[in-house]
Amino acid sequence: MFNETKKSIEWGEETLTLETGKVARQADGSVIATLGETSVMANVTFAKKQKPGQDFFPLTVHYQEKYYAAGKVPGGFFKREARPTEKETLTARLIDRPLRPLFVPGFKNEVLVMCTVLSHDLVNDPDMVAMIAASAALTISGAPFMGPIAGARVGFEDGEYILNPTVDDMQDLRLNPEQRLDLVVAGTKDAVMMVESEAYELSEAEMLGAVKFAHDAIQPVLDLIIDLAEDCAKEPFDFSPPDYSELSAAVKAAGETEMRAAFAISDKQERTTAVAAARETIMAALSDEQKEDPNLGSAMKGLEASILRGDVVKTGKRIDGRKTDEIRDIVCETGLLPRTHGSALFTRGETQGLVVTTLGTGDDEQFIDALHGNFKSNFLLHYNFPPYSVGEAGRVGPPGRREIGHGKLAWRALQAVLPAATDFPYTVRVVSEITESNGSSSMASVCGGSLSMMDAGVPLKAPVAGVAMGLILEEDGSYAILSDILGDEDHLGDMDFKVAGTEAGITSLQMDIKIAGITPEIMEKALEQAKAGRIHILGEMAKSITGAQDFSIHAPRIETMQIPTDKIREVIGSGGKVIREIVEVSGAKVDINDEGIIKIASPNGEAIKKAYDMIHSIVAEPEEGMVYTGTVVKIVDFGAFVNFFGKRDGLVHVSQIENRRLNHPSDVLKEGQEVKVKLLGFDDRGKVRLSMKVVDQETGEEIKKEEAPAD
């Protein structure tokens, strides 16, 4: 009934298996990839006809993590998987980016790739397994895909690169300082297609070495996919790239002069208007048949690309007049918004971000329910890209895939310089509002985020800056690497290469290639040119702010204290009675974790001190021989009980009240009376023994034995 094909190799410390022919047989391509005990099913389907008027390539990649894969039941009211999580969205983008450039140019049929996590061993991250499965499924599907590709994750510890580090190793690099890198690389046999990383100030050489290490590591996986395809791939789909050379020639003849003049305008808004006018001129010169040609958009783009790309490679001058390695003018401002905790306006040419930092407490941490466990994050970065930032009227709604991806890129860049939670016990939320955009808005978020956090008083290890690089690679092998690319250069170029870091090293790197890959030599030159740009931007940022500022009066203050874990119950009290009383009396917010770390938060320093003192009085142990002020809470025949140390009571025996014989303690004491007592010690049962007669009740000074009156 089944025509199964299964291939396996030893990859790293695990066995990687690809199998097809048993599940989802009606899909064009279906592969289950298994690494260790982590399994992902990838299914590929594609339309056999192009939709009329389709002028772009409609590739959609979905990645789903099923809770059953880790033996879990989803939370929430409905108890089922709902909209994609941030991890699922980011992984879908991770898979999409290296696949998209490898479809035959001109193919515009709809393609759907669905990756479903079926089993998770809590050791191997499913994202790389999903990428391998998707590539294998496309390779055997018959779709016009010029793959395969494969992906690998690389760590860096003690100067050694590590292939496929575990989920726990990569969970939070801030908590694992020995592990300095989380790098994902995807590529073909000959070239790297995509890079994504979070790093802890790695040098350019170390980062390039990691990319080369990953590219070498994926070669056996590529051979495995090819081996699978040789046994079971479907017949290639009958598709020939459309020949629209005559249409391209007509478009060029009709408007090359106008288009070239439009691209000579440096101002974005004026250039956009001029380009639109040039397109209208071209349309007016074309026949009705040419206007209806579905390849007209591609012909237009080809003309624009040839003008922009050719001028840069031949003359070294870009459309805004800059040299290839020149950064646009930068203006940095901080402290713009009076009621926020920290704010910055970062402007680089026609790209601008208003970035705001808010400091919160432990209650504000983000709770993340992942397949490999539940955890909290005390650093949040949200990126917003409204339509007005590019002068358009468009949809406004929840963040899309692009906004989530750009926000995560900026998060990775800044994560490496945050102080440890034990040193800075705040939840930090950074929001980047992109107010203008003409290329590299995610890197503006990195620069603005660094400025904003320093303005809020966050003690960063070092400022961080980011720059977006571009590449124009011509067919004859000539190329130009561009620093701080514009939107048009991104749109019409061959590479989007974003690098962020401190003066000491790289903290984040992301690379997307629109062609069949670049060589290590080009990547090395791009990294060196990016470093020069990054150092320049850091210098411009330093003119505005160089370190953490004083806290805003509107920001909460947080004091931390460590108590013995066996005292946690006493601080909380029965049903939370004690801690509620502390909060009500002091006015501060109090948070206790299972390790006995207490965070006391309030904008009011007096409230923090009050809560701190109340907690200290509960958990601290009274010292023998010390004098305390207490209150008589109960009188009995043999003495009086005095509350003297927070909630602690001790007995003053009748013989220790005064230096004379008393008939009854009530002769000199009454309930509610304030007295001074000395802690004599503890009896055999641990009960506290106190004395009043050795303390001057007015001054609180201890009475020396020779000063004490005789009985």
UniProtKB/Swiss-Prot annotation:
Enzyme Commission number, as recorded: 2.7.7.8
Gene Ontology biological-process entries: mRNA catabolic process; RNA processing
Leading EC class: transferase
Pfam families from the UniProt entry: KH_1 (PF00013), PNPase (PF03726), RNase_PH (PF01138), RNase_PH_C (PF03725), S1 (PF00575)
Segments forming domain KH: 556-615
Cofactor or coenzyme needed: Mg(2+)
Subcellular location: Cytoplasm
Alphabetized InterPro entries for the sequence: ExoRNase_PH_dom1 (IPR001247), ExoRNase_PH_dom2 (IPR015847), ExoRNase_PH_dom2_sf (IPR036345), KH_dom (IPR004087), KH_dom_type_1 (IPR004088), KH_dom_type_1_sf (IPR036612), NA-bd_OB-fold (IPR012340), PNPase (IPR012162)
CDD domains per the UniProt record, alphabetical: KH-I_PNPase, RNase_PH_PNPase_1, RNase_PH_PNPase_2, S1_PNPase
Major subcellular site: cytoplasm
NCBIfam families reported in the protein's UniProt record: polynuc_phos (TIGR03591), PRK11824.1 (NF008805)
Annotated function: Involved in mRNA degradation. Catalyzes the phosphorolysis of single-stranded polyribonucleotides processively in the 3'- to 5'-direction.
Annotated protein name in UniProt: Polyribonucleotide nucleotidyltransferase
Gene source species: Roseobacter denitrificans (strain ATCC 33942 / OCh 114) (Erythrobacter sp. (strain OCh 114))
